[in-house]
């Protein structure tokens, strides 16, 4: 797990100069298009060879990054805590120094010599670890308190998402991958978080879900969350390509598709997304999972029924999974099982889904941690996430490996393993301080006291702290100088 991912950097992370942009315009021509040979899975389009030597890449999940945090502010020193090394799984006493939005150094616990204006966090007896990452959220989804006539509203969804993102931040999450929401609300939240306009984790947004007519997330069209503001129904390869492009235009960091679809449709969607530099994840089951893995999907969501052959193909092609075990345990245990969205001839059960997880674990499939926070589930963090980690342990993971999955593994699946997921000099400063030892007791993850996201100390002693607004100086003409 120590090696960096082999897949190329997403276009969403490339900061281009005007010259580089001009050079990249030609990529749409046939001579540059990386269309796969017939029958072979499409590969991600790596634009890095076209950049000028030494060109910087962005640090946020937006194609045109916002101005980075200034690097001339006071240092933030997290002193003498138990540092959880998410790469090795070891813990050791250390002091972490943050400058601007990056980790400046990881030093011995008794290191000294800070500037007089340095901010000091005394982490003695506490665990210092990378910020948590949730790989499957729906922060703009309505909950039971949402009025029915507001559930399809982009404005209401944006406000609801801002509230839910605060809950995630307070719980120690510094990144979430949001896999379906109302209209453009997830894109707005992603942009606002990246710009520092709202206190929130980084948001890697899919925007909406793409499916065939009558497919998943459209089963109950009378409900707003199963309507066109949340799910886009398309038919035919060209329509699937077009919807991928629309999501890209809106600001997607990832593409989410769902069954049902035809083989040529799923292949077209994956090919188009990969040409744009985006990865694709799929919510699917049975034969649709086989179609997706054969077409070159990057990831499969949920522990839904799939054949042993599909699992073997996932392992061979290094296709990852995000099993979302806890939410399915709740859903299936309460109902005793339910029918798949594309067939009423079989039911899914909690034990059957857990068996799928264990098969994937045995096959060596890399699995990320996500909660599938639909409805009131956003109100249940961090308990829902801790429960998810416990299911990982029940399925064969050690506590250490579960925490690695929650941090560095998730970061690598986001194509951000070089910037997030571990506390190392030079990486972005996404750090939490936990009053306990989560590597020994996962329940201690509920005791997050400090959260630093992008170098900003946002949660202090468990409370959200936002800087006071500083008025911008007036432009000329100035007000009357002789008036007091």
Where are the regions that the model predicts?
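Histidine/acidic-residue-rich catalytic or RNA/ligand-binding cores of hydrolases
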Residues: 143-146, 186, 290-296, 325-340, ...
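Metal-associated gating/positioning segment near the N- to mid-region
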Residues: 126-192, 213-217, 221-223, 292-295
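Divalent metal-dependent hydrolysis catalytic cores, especially in the metallo-beta-lactamase
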Residues: 160-186, 200-207, 250-259, 279, ...
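C-terminal cap of metal-dependent C-N hydrolases
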Residues: 81, 428-469
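Active-site core of metal-dependent hydrolases
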Residues: 213, 257-354, 373-376, 396-398, ...
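His/Asp/Glu-enriched, well-ordered alpha-helical/loop segment
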Residues: 152, 275, 351-437, 457
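Histidine-rich, glycine-flanked metal-binding segment
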Residues: 58-75, 83, 88-129
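Histidine/acidic-residue-rich, glycine-tolerant segments that coordinate divalent metal ions
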Residues: 195-292, 303
């Amino acid at each position: 797990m120590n090696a960096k991912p082999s897949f190329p950097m997403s276009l969403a992370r490339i900061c281009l100069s005007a010259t580089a942009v001009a050079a990249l315009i030609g990529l749409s021509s046939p001579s540059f298009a990386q269309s796969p040979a017939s029958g072979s899975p499409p590969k991600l389009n790596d634009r890095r060879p076209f950049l000028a030597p030494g060109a910087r890449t962005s640090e946020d999940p937006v194609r045109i990054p916002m101005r980075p945090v200034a690097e001339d502010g006071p240092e933030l020193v997290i002193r003498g805590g138990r540092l959880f090394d998410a790469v090795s799984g070891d813990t050791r006493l250390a002091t972490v120094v943050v400058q601007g939005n990056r980790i400046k150094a990881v030093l011995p616990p008794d290191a000294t010599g800070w500037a007089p204006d340095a901010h000091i966090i005394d982490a003695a007896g506490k665990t210092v670890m990378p910020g948590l990452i949730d790989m499957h959220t729906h922060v703009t989804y309505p909950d039971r308190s949402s009025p029915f006539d507001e559930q399809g509203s982009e404005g209401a969804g944006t406000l609801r998402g801002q509230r839910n993102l605060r809950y995630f931040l307070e719980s120690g999450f510094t990144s979430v991958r949001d896999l379906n929401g109302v209209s453009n609300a997830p894109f707005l939240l992603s942009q606002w978080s990246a710009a520092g306009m709202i206190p929130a984790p980084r948001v890697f947004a899919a925007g909406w879900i793409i499916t065939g007519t009558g497919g998943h997330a459209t089963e109950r069209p009378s409900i707003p969350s199963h309507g066109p503001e949340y799910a886009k129904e398309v038919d035919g390869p060209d329509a699937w390509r077009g919807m991928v492009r629309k999501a890209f235009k809106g600001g997607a960091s990832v593409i989410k598709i769902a069954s049902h679809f035809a083989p040529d449709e799923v292949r077209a969607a994956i090919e188009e997304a990969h040409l744009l530099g985006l990865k694709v994840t799929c919510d699917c089951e049975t034969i649709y999972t086989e179609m997706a893995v054969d077409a070159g999907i990057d990831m499969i969501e949920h522990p839904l029924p799939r054949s042993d052959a599909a699992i073997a193909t996932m392992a061979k092609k290094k296709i990852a999974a995000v099993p979302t075990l806890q939410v399915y345990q709740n859903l299936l245990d309460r109902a005793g099982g339910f029918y798949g969205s594309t067939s009423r001839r079989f039911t899914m059960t909690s034990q059957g889904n857990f068996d799928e997880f264990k098969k994937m674990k045995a096959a060596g499939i890399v699995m990320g941690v996500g909660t599938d926070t639909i409805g009131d589930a956003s109100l249940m963090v961090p308990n829902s996430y801790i429960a998810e980690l416990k299911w990982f342990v029940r399925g064969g993971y050690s506590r250490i490996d579960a925490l690695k999955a929650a941090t560095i593994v998730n970061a690598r699946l986001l194509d951000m393993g070089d910037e997030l997921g571990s506390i190392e000099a030079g990486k972005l400063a996404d750090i939490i301080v936990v009053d306990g030892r989560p590597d020994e007791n996962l329940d201690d993850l509920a005791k997050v006291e400090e959260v630093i996201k992008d170098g900003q100390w946002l949660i202090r002693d468990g409370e959200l702290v936002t800087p006071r607004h500083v008025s911008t100086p007036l432009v000329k003409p100035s007000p009357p100088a002789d008036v007091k």
